Structures are given as structure tokens and as C-alpha cells.
Curated annotation (Swiss-Prot):
Keywords associated with the record: Cytoplasm, Lipid biosynthesis, Lipid metabolism, Phospholipid biosynthesis, Phospholipid metabolism, Transferase
GO CC aspect terms: cytoplasm
Family per record: Belongs to the PlsX family.
Organism: Rhodospirillum centenum (strain ATCC 51521 / SW)
Name the UniProt record assigns to this protein: Phosphate acyltransferase
EC number(s) per entry: 2.3.1.274
Length: 355
């Protein structure tokens, strides 16, 4: 997509909204020159902020609403009472065709509930999944689900594998991303029934040549595969564990380099290397979790991020629109279904069924 398109922004979602949202959009404006912005929220607070960024204001409109979804609101309550909230109206803009996608740093559960209710799921997708990036020794990988579905059956996991593959191709530019199912061991007999059934289905699918079987927790950071598929329960624990471990080692380094004069001197000598490491592991670089499987593009920013992180979330949304992400998911699902039907009609499968 080379023509201009609009991104709807939940201007009141996040710990530092609307300041962070407006400042982030201005940063993203340079990266995404073909984008217009629809800010949804309290116009009295948004307009003065836009006045600070004339170039952004020139490509922006504001849709006023005084209501916002509270960060601690239950999804069911937000869905029932938040019809006029900035989050809901931003999603409505996508459903109405006024925007190509929506970005919000608001309540994750509420955003998922509203997006699924308003936008619905793509044909062939039973449940949407949350996907995001992980830094690895080999670059970056994609992991899903990160919390939308605590329990998943084999069909859900296969659908996640398809969506993760398309996401990796679209955003990371990998032609043949490898896929693995997160499990408690790499042996075929390990894991519960659903994950073993999913593995069997993937081996018989159009993704078979890139499916690497089961991967374990230590394979995430190693970058053993490009796409890691799991249920939302395990995925969310893995995500939070990785975030906590990164903070732990950052604190360890800080304390170590403050421990003595010689340690401080060592830090000064290695300052350039540590700056590269800091940039490589900066969580703002990986901000922007995608709700995959919906009929519209919906990206969730971390609620506590700053303008740089929010700009990256906008960049993810823009990439998905530009590369026709949802259309590619539809094509991949159709190809997968055709391969499964062909396998079912093959002489080998017919003979096996007869036996």
C-alpha cells in the first residue's frame, strides 16, 4: 500500500496519555510519511499538545470524547459501559473504514474484548492471539500467544502458527520463518495432548518444511526458531520472566560498576559496548504487541511506555497495513486448508483410513 491511510490512536490510553501519545505520533510521522492520524479522546487536552507539533497537526484530526477506559477495569465491564470511551471509538473508526488500524496503550483485557466484539475474527480463525518480538542471539523472534487465551486446543495452536509465520514474514522480512511449539521437552512424547496433536497437524500442513517440532524455554533467547507458538498462559509467564530477568541483570551490572573505583574505570572504558547492549535490549524497540486474527489491525502498546516506545508501536501498525497483513493471513489459511484437504484425499491417507 503506497497511498495514504489513517491510524486511529486511543489518545487517553496509557500511564502518560495523552502527552506520550501525541509526542510518539510526531516521532512516528517521520518514519511513516504516508500516515494521517485520528486522535480519539479529550479534545481540550489533545489540541494544546498538537499545537506543539505543527507538522503532526497538519495530518491529524481529533474525535472528541471525555470518557476513557480505566486501567483496572474488568474487560466485561469495559465492554458494557465503555461504548463512548476513547478506546472503543478508536476501534469503531477501524470498523467504519475511517482508519486502517488502531493503536492503544490502554487496558489490555478491555482492548482485546472490544476489538474482538467490534472487529470480529478473520475467516478460519477461532481466537485472536497476542504476538510480539523477543530479542535473541540470532536477532529477533516472534512469540504468540502472550496472554489472550489461557487454554488452547490443537486447532488454535495451528492457527497461531499460521498467523505467526505471516507476521514474521511481514514485519521481520523473513522469507521462510521456522516454527516451534513451546513444550516441556523436545521429545515427541512430551507435553499434553493438545500440543502433540498440534505438532502432528503442523507436520502434515503447508508449514511442514519450516516446522521444527518442540522447543523449550531456553530456546526462546537462543533464537532456535523464528516463531514460537504457545498458549497464552505459558506465553505470558515467559514474557514476564524475560522482562524480569532483563531488569535483574541490568541492576546487577549497575551495582557491580558502582562497587569500586576500578569497576567505575572499567565501565568508562567499555562505555561504547554497553551503550550498544543497552540499545539492543531496550524494551521500547520491541513495543507493539499485535492482536492477530482480527478483521482489522489492532496494536497494543505497553501502558508504561514513553513517546519512543509508542512511536515503535505505531510503526508496527503501519508495517502491517502497508504489507497487507490480514490479506496474507487469509491467503495462508486458504493454502493450509487446501494442503490438508489434499493430504486427506491422497492414496496413502485413503489406504490408512481403510485399514
Amino acid at each position: 500500500m503506497s497511498e495514504r491511510f489513517c491510524i486511529a490512536l486511543d489518545a487517553m490510553g496509557g500511564d502518560h496519555a495523552p502527552d506520550m501519545v501525541v509526542a510518539g505520533a510526531d516521532i512516528a510521522r517521520e518514519r511513516c510519511p504516508n500516515v494521517d492520524y485520528l486522535f480519539v479522546g479529550d479534545e481540550e487536552r489533545i489540541r494544546p499538545l498538537l499545537d506543539k507539533y505543527p507538522a503532526l497537526a497538519a495530518v491529524s484530526t481529533v474525535r472528541h470524547t471525555p470518557d476513557a477506559v480505566a486501567g483496572d477495569a474488568k474487560p466485561s465491564v469495559a465492554l458494557r459501559t465503555g461504548r463512548n470511551s476513547s478506546m472503543r471509538l478508536a476501534i469503531d473508526a477501524v470498523a467504519a473504514g475511517d482508519a486502517a488500524c488502531v493503536v492503544s496503550a490502554g487496558n489490555t483485557g478491555a482492548l482485546m474484548a472490544m476489538a474482538k466484539f467490534v472487529l470480529k475474527t478473520l475467516p478460519g480463525i477461532d481466537r485472536p492471539a497476542i504476538a510480539s518480538f523477543f530479542p535473541t542471539l540470532r536477532g529477533e523472534s516472534v512469540m504468540l500467544d502472550l496472554g489472550a487465551n489461557l487454554e488452547c486446543d490443537a486447532d488454535n495452536l495451528v492457527q497461531f502458527a499460521v498467523m505467526g509465520t505471516v507476521f514474521s514474514r511481514t514485519v521481520l522480512g523473513l522469507l521462510e520463518p521456522t516454527v516451534g511449539l513451546l513444550n516441556v521437552g523436545s521429545e515427541e512424547q512430551k507435553g499434553h495432548g493438545s500440543i502433540r496433536q498440534a505438532a502432528s497437524a503442523l507436520r502434515a500442513s503447508a508449514l511442514a518444511k519450516n516446522f521444527r517440532g518442540f522447543v523449550e524455554g531456553n530456546d526462546i533467547a537462543a533464537g532456535t526458531v523464528d516463531v514460537i507458538v504457545t498458549d497464552g498462559f505459558s506465553g505470558n509467564i515467559a514474557l514476564k520472566t524475560a522482562e524480569g530477568t532483563a531488569k535483574l541483570y541490568a541492576e546487577f551490572l549497575k551495582r557491580t560498576f558502582k562497587s569500586s573505583l576500578l569497576a567505575k574505570l572499567g565501565y568508562l572504558l567499555a562505555h561504547g559496548a554497553f551503550q550498544k547492549l543497552r540499545l539492543r535490549t531496550d524494551p521500547r524497540r520491541y513495543n507493539g504487541a499485535m492482536f492477530l486474527g482480527l478483521r482489522g489491525v489492532c496494536v497494543k502498546s505497553h501502558g508504561g511506555t514513553d513517546a519512543v516506545g509508542f512511536a515503535n508501536a505505531i510503526g508496527v501498525a503501519s508495517d502491517l497495513v502497508v504489507h497487507g497483513f490480514n490479506e496474507k493471513i487469509r491467503d495462508e489459511l486458504a493454502r493450509l486448508q487446501a494442503a490438508l484437504e489434499a493430504a486427506a484425499l491422497s492414496p496413502e491417507s485413503t489406504e490408512a483410513a481403510a485399514v
